[in-house]
Amino acid sequence: MKEDAEGFIKSLFFGNIREDMVFPFPRLEPEVAETVAMMQEAVGKFADEHIDSTKWDEDAAMPREIVDKVSELGLMGLLVEERHNGLGLPMMAYGHIFEKLATYDSALTVTVGAHQSIGYKALLLYGNEEQRERFLPRLATGELIAAFCLTEPSSGSDAASIQTKAVLSEDGKHYT
């Protein structure tokens, strides 16, 4: 079999990544591509001015102000519809923007990515309109940070057997 006729999965199995079959990503619609280019430029400028990965690693903490700043850029609501304070971008645009952010700091990328992918994705896909109206605007602006709690002592990481419940504190300000 000729090398150029070898399938992607087969070549991947043998440790050969056929970049010609992966890159570039499929083309974006022109107006989305323009938005992505502007977002990537803004991410680069933001990163150059504000990201200090070494300090964050030394402090074992990322300042909340950083999350506030990426929220101001719109990065916390890339997939949320505009009517809910998001940018309403397609997944491909999300991928391009995250590719840029990941070149600067993986911890920030995971924070922003988890918020949208495993954090509020179920709300986007399965939430009713009342739930979307209640939560998405604040999730898209970073006022709320979405989370997904999976591992617990009695079930490990088996999501089907989780028994933990969130209980509102007596002062009504947070859940435990």
Name the predicted role of every residue range.
Residues M1-S53, A60, E65:
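Extended, charge-enriched "interface" segments that sit outside catalytic cores
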Residues V36-W56, I66-E82, M92, H96:
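N-terminal cofactor/phosphate-binding cores enriched in small/glycine residues
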Residues M38, A61, E65, M92, ...:
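Conserved active-site and cofactor/substrate-binding residues in soluble primary-metabolism enzymes
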Residues Q40, V67, F98, R132-L136, ...:
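A generic alpha-helix structural signal
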Residues W56-P63, E82, V110-A114, T151:
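Short coil/turn segments at secondary-structure boundaries
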Residues A61, D68-K69, S154-G156:
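A short beta-turn/loop motif at secondary-structure boundaries
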Residues E72-G142:
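Internal helix-loop-helix
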Residues G86-L87, E130-T176:
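Glycine-rich, Trp-frequent "lid" loop and neighboring beta-strands that shape
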